[in-house]
Amino acid sequence: MERLLVLVRHGQSEWNLRNLFTGWRDPDLTERGVAEARAAGRGLKRDGYGFDVAFTSALIRAQRTCALVLEEMGLSEIPILRERALNERDYGDLSGLNKDEARARWGDAQVHAWRRGYDVRPPGGESLKDTAARVLPCYVATILPRVMAGQRVLVAAHGNSLRALVMVLDGLTEAQVPDLQIRTGVPLVYRLNADTTVASKTVLDQDVDAGR
């Protein structure tokens, strides 16, 4: 039985381009973000992947990425389930602030701890640990059962919600989290064993400019 799980972070958003903390704010994709999503779909189709169901967050940048990936694959008709639990980490009072301005105000070390630490909350926001506390139950209760039943599953979400998932799938420690990068529009392809552990992982790098 095939147990396929593919994770993809949304393409570049307007606030990614402007170097702003985004969190639960809802900017759309940039032109490059659209191209990244389409490239991900082309690459997945080229390599012979298909999906039976897709999950995404309540935010437009992830939803559009999901739709564009599936459109490129000719799979726009499959069910797309929106889960608020897959939303990006809530950056609280940092949301909408320029990251360089935040570093100037609070210092590099503090901003790095807020962005990359596991259990450090920005003012009024969530830590990665908090984010994992809503993402992982959603994965276990809603996504994983479909994978284990043999459905091929796509998850289009966000840097931090996917970091929480990858931490578990890859067996990473809290100390390894600061170095974990989830790139925009790059599919992470997992095949799972019968006991839900990871059998294999493939990173599908894409040529964003091809086919534009």
Curated annotation (Swiss-Prot):
Leader sequence residues: none
Catalytic residues of the enzyme: H10, E88
PROSITE patterns: PG_MUTASE
Protein residues bound to substrate: 9-16, 22-23, 61, 88-91, 99, 115-116, 159-160
Pfam families: His_Phos_1
Catalytic reaction list: (2R)-2-phosphoglycerate = (2R)-3-phosphoglycerate
GO process terms (BP): gluconeogenesis; glycolytic process
Assembly, per entry: Homodimer.
Name by which UniProt lists this protein: 2,3-bisphosphoglycerate-dependent phosphoglycerate mutase
Gene transcribed to yield this protein: gpmA
Keywords, alphabetical: Gluconeogenesis, Glycolysis, Isomerase
Keyword Isomerase: yes
SUPFAM superfamilies reported for this sequence: Phosphoglycerate mutase-like
A single GO molecular function term of this UniProt record: phosphoglycerate mutase activity
Disulfides per UniProt: none
Annotated transmembrane regions: none
Protein role: Catalyzes the interconversion of 2-phosphoglycerate and 3-phosphoglycerate.
Isomerase as UniProt keyword: yes
Family per similarity comment: Belongs to the phosphoglycerate mutase family. BPG-dependent PGAM subfamily.
Sites annotated Transition state stabilizer: H158
EC number: 5.4.2.11
Main EC class the enzyme belongs to: isomerase
Highest rank taxon of the organism: Bacteria
Pathway: Carbohydrate degradation; glycolysis; pyruvate from D-glyceraldehyde 3-phosphate: step 3/5
